[in-house]
Amino acid sequence: RAALKSGGIVYMTFTPESGMTEVVTQFMTKLGQSQALYHATWDDAIHLDEDVKAEILAALPPHERAMRSKGIPVLGSGLVFPLDENDLKVEPFAIPEYWPRLCGIDFGWDHPTAAVWIAWDRDTDTVYVYDCYRKSAETPVVHSAAIRERGEWVPVVWPHDGSQHDKGSGKPLAEIYRKQGVNMAHKHFENPTGGISIEPGIMDMLQRMQTGRFKVFNYLGLWFEELRMYHRKDGKIVKAHDDLMSATRYASQSLQFASLDRPKKRPRKAISDYNHYEHHEGAYA
């Protein structure tokens, strides 16, 4: 506790040993206008050389290493995806036109509406997450505009709650997005084997990550923020701060709907009646 009579700055440092407590969650997801959060890692401790870091890390239990070295909270009964996030990261690159693309969306209001865009390298069966979007307390009109900006032609897969009727218009939520020009799939998401349970998709994503067939552009900070908080408690996935993860699951489990279709480029029209042959007739005689 501190009283800032002089209007100064208070620094608070801590290691999140108790996991995602209310205080940690508040700083990681709901910062006030006068607050800021900086993840200080061992890389900021210039007095620690690489040999010392390796020695300390080796002495720590595996589940504490990310928490001690990177300030990432120990979460519940464990991370849903217990991997080094650096193994998922790739430098952004121009996506080949022959890779199909797809978007997954998770609807929200008090919690964010989230969308994730993926590209599929069919030669190696590798999924690449190349963009994401997350926003709370906005209308479908706002979300639709953000989705269209990233390619109106990209198909969008959506969960079963998109069939529910919007309280304002009385229309199904998915239909509202469709009317706004979003290329919504014709029906709600289902796993490739049927049903809408979470675990089959989670296991497939984990296997892809473990075998190097799931990659994420390294600048997608919001996506990695959720990855670090996506955890289980008593064996069950905690349904909080999981919007981008859900959208990713919908997309990665719907590769059969990924599309190559793009707007065809129209031939450019002549901008004048100037006839090159007529004015250079002598050159062709």
Give the positions of each predicted feature.
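ASCE P-loop NTPase helicase motor core
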Residues: 1-60
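Short, conserved catalytic or adaptor-binding loops enriched in Gly and charged residues
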Residues: 27-33, 86, 92-94, 175-180, ...
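ATPase catalytic-site recognition across NTP-hydrolyzing enzymes
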Residues: 45-107
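Short acidic/glycine-rich loop or secondary-structure boundary segments that cap or lie
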Residues: 49, 77-78, 90-93, 111-115, ...
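Generic detector of well-ordered alpha-helical packing
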Residues: 102, 107, 162, 243-244
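Short beta-strand scaffold segments in enzyme catalytic cores
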Residues: 113-119, 249
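Mg2+-dependent endonuclease catalytic cores in nucleic-acid-processing enzymes, primarily RNase H-like
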Residues: 116, 123-239, 258-285
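Stable alpha-helical structural segments in soluble proteins, enriched in small hydrophobic residues
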Residues: 243-255
